[in-house]
């Protein structure tokens, strides 16, 4: 009897969770697609942040560009529009570039604010992408939006999902 009761609770919880996820996904906001991006991965150093600041000052007034960054414990990624590549490489000269990946696209998706209180949203999205054979190079997120970085060839298949 206890096992059956636990099973009913589990099924009920599963239904409520998937219902909440579906509701959030139906209320997704804007989806923005950007192409011709380059992903730079640099080793963390004492001079990396000052160089990022210098780079941001140089591109501050540039219109219609893509720029995002994320910092881990040992490395920092900077993703930029291809047109910014010469400026970035000049400013970051002397830094250790671990990897550079060209020909990338990004899809940025805005989620409703309640997404942070509902477990499983990202799992649901990434599971579906995996089933469709979409390879994700990187994911960068804020509280209410996330950006999926992938090869430009993959972006068309993602849009059709």
PLM features: residue spans?
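Short glycine/threonine-rich loop-to-helix capping motif typified by GTGT followed
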Residues: 81-82, 148-156
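Cytosolic regulatory regions of ion transport systems
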Residues: 73-75, 138, 145
């Amino acid at each position: 009897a206890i096992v059956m009761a636990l099973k009913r609770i589990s099924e009920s919880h599963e239904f409520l969770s998937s219902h909440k996820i579906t509701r959030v996904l139906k209320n997704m906001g804007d989806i923005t697609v950007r192409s011709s991006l380059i992903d730079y991965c640099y080793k963390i150093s004492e001079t990396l942040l000052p160089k990022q600041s210098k780079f941001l000052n140089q591109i501050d007034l540039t219109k219609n560009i893509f720029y995002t960054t994320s910092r881990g414990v040992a490395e920092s990624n900077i993703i930029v529009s291809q047109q910014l590549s010469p400026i970035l490489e000049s400013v970051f000269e002397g830094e250790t570039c671990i990897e550079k990946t060209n020909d990338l696209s990004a899809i940025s998706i805005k989620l409703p604010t309640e997404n942070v209180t509902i477990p499983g949203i990202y799992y649901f999205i990434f599971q579906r992408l995996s089933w469709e054979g979409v390879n994700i190079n990187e994911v960068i997120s804020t509280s209410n939006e996330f950006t999926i970085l992938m090869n430009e060839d993959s972006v068309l298949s993602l849009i059709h999902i």
